[in-house]
């Protein structure tokens, strides 16, 4: 049976004390590395060394700025004997971005770690070794400069989980929604205007009757 922990459901502004959006799958897989990732993991009894795979949806800070803390914790604090490096699955250019972010935050502290203990994977589809999951990555509608994508996560049982990343309504989501057992949408802004790069409460009405969960919330708790 698959386990999905919502360890953060807030948007970039962390409304009502919600931590930044992040999920943990089967206590081995993270989707994104928000700035609050270390306390988020500790709240559910995990640490950075518990994680075998990280999937990055896009480059915005509330999804990637936890990278320095995560890597630092994994190297020094929660280090354990591991047979394989951490696998980080992301789009081309992401290795340079996260490396620059991490080494800029902690110069010399991560020397050798990011090249030797992290395996950077740019494939659009992959099997997540050591888990019961595989994924297909697909483009979504968000700030283009952040190279936004979602993930169709495929469990060996046949269960399909559609993680839409940060996105407004788009063909990529609609084309895959029909084969998903659960759809995770972000609902990052209220109904106060036109926001093509986010779902609003009015937008998600179109998913009524489908198995949908929401994250990146701006609504009060």
Predicted features along the sequence, with ranges:
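Active-site metal-binding motif and surrounding structural segment of the metallo-beta-lactamase
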Residues: 36-87, 182
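A short alpha/beta connector and helix-capping loop motif
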Residues: 173-188
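Charged helix-capping and loop-helix junction motifs
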Residues: 196-205
